[in-house]
Swiss-Prot record:
It comes from Thermus thermophilus (strain ATCC 27634 / DSM 579 / HB8). The gene is murA. This is UDP-N-acetylglucosamine 1-carboxyvinyltransferase. Signal peptide: none annotated. UDP-N-acetyl-alpha-D-glucosamine binds at R95, R124, P125, V126, D127, Q128, D306, I328. One of its GO terms (cellular component) is cytoplasm.
């Protein structure tokens, strides 16, 4: 017999208290990749201590980066690129690590990156990454599951994306930041993309149009170092707000960017909850009788796809009928079957999820990706009775100190070890 960890949740207790939002993982990862662009020292203040960040640091160390933690501050320096190959054993763990491709191409003139891995929901191609690098003048090819790129001059050109793409936009920005120049059309406008642009500007690149569909970037022949603070995590903040809503609790978030959460805050307000918003704080008080609503996940500033599963879990507790559509990842519904085990009434047809809210009950469930895991936690917190959530690995990729933070809000949760039968030889 082997042993795995499960999250044990005794549901039915409203979450109450205050919470400071951690920095955004989805902003930290491309900024970490951007550290490859300069030989100068970089200091990142308040970096999330998550498994995905550790994987990215392992990859950067393989490529030549030296780093050291000082509390939650991270010091990095890449005097030289020691390898231009990002191996499968690291890239296969996390899709975001694919972003080092553009940075390697800019700094070393070539980059070789294995097919990305990470959360297995829907079809998430890298065609827009390839299109961008080719439009900028790189030679790109794929062989045996590895993507290769090479350049003979600084990359420059005009990239017209087929659709807004966060990863593709970030890849192109990194590829031209060191001596190149580009105009990106249909660029992603997400806060994490804007944060990367601000970081590149700190290093010496000229970036215009951040937060708009047309971004212009002019790289510098040599980038400098600097100190940077990463934006707060809007997905973590949204998860805790939805957990407070599902448990009919109250919550104050500090160190948050409310303007990054407009779509969610509007839904919660329309659902009947009370909200007060300041420059960097949100006060939330749940109504005991919330109303259902329609969720349509879209590109920013629309409703975030990463909050769609968590919102689904909340709506499963709201009397009445709600509907959920994901325009980013239309098949992002790995959480539906597990929520059904807790008594949720969910009907998926033609990629439209209909949710009939009711009181949930505890069950043994399994997280199949990061945000599906967040959805199960929210459902379990609101449910009657005990739940056990397998797949703690996914939760630890997306939520720092989740158990301790929920306990601080009054939740009855703890991690425990569970025996697992091992496969026979």
């Amino acid at each position: 017999m082997g042993v795995s960890r499960v999250l044990h949740v005794e549901g039915g207790t409203p979450l109450k208290g205050e919470l400071r939002v951690y920095p955004a993982k989805n902003a930290a990862l491309p900024i970490l990749a951007a550290s490859l662009l300069t030989p100068e020292p970089i200091t990142l203040v308040e970096v999330p201590r998550l498994r995905d960040v550790e994987v990215m640091l392992e990859l950067l160390a393989h490529l030549g980066t030296q780093y050291a933690w000082e509390g939650r501050t991270l010091h990095l320096q890449t005097p030289e690129i020691k390898s231009t190959h990002a191996p499968y054993e690291l890239v296969g763990q996390m899709r975001a690590s694919f972003i080092v491709w553009g940075a390697l191409l800019a700094r070393a003139g070539e980059g070789h990156v294995s097919m990305p891995g990470g959360c297995a929901f829907g079809f998430r191609p890298v065609d827009q990454h390839i299109k961008a690098l080719e439009a900028l003048g790189a030679e790109v090819w794929e062989e045996d599951g590895t993507f290769h790129a090479r350049r003979t001059r600084p990359l420059s050109g005009r990239v017209v994306f087929d659709l807004p793409t966060v990863g593709g936009t970030e890849q192109a920005m990194l590829a031209v930041a060191l001596g190149g120049e580009a105009t990106l059309v249909q660029a992603a406008v997400e806060p994490e993309v804007v944060d990367l642009g601000h970081f590149l500007a700190l290093l010496g690149a000229e970036v215009e149009g951040l937060g708009s569909p047309i971004v212009r970037i002019k790289g510098a022949p040599r980038l400098k170092g600097g100190t940077y603070r990463i934006i707060p995590d809007r997905i973590e903040a949204g998860t805790y707000l939805l957990a407070a809503a599902a448990t009919r609790g109250s919550l104050t978030l500090e160190g948050v960017r409310p303007d990054h959460l407009d779509a969610l805050l509007d839904k919660l307000w329309r659902s009947g909850h009370r909200l007060e918003v300041g420059e960097d704080w949100i006060r939330f008080r749940a109504t005991p009788d919330p109303a259902p609503f329609h969720v349509e996940a879209r590109e920013y500033p629309g409703f975030p796809t990463d909050l769609q599963p968590i919102a689904t879990a909340y709506l499963a507790t709201v009397p009445g009928q709600s509907t959920v559509v994901d325009r980013i990842y239309p098949d992002r519904f790995t959480h539906v079957g597990e929520l059904a085990r807790m008594g949720a009434e969910l009907y998926l047809r033609d990629r439209i999820l209909t949710v009939q809210g009711r009181r949930l009950h505890g069950a043994q469930v399994k997280a199949l990706d990061i945000r599906a895991g967040g959805a199960l936690v929210v459902a379990a917190l609101s449910a009657e009775g005990a739940s056990e959530i397998e797949g703690v690995y996914f939760l630890e990729r997306g939520y720092e100190h989740l158990t301790e933070r929920l306990q601080a809000l009054g939740a009855r949760v703890h991690l425990r070890e569970s025996p697992v039968a091992l496969a026979a030889d």
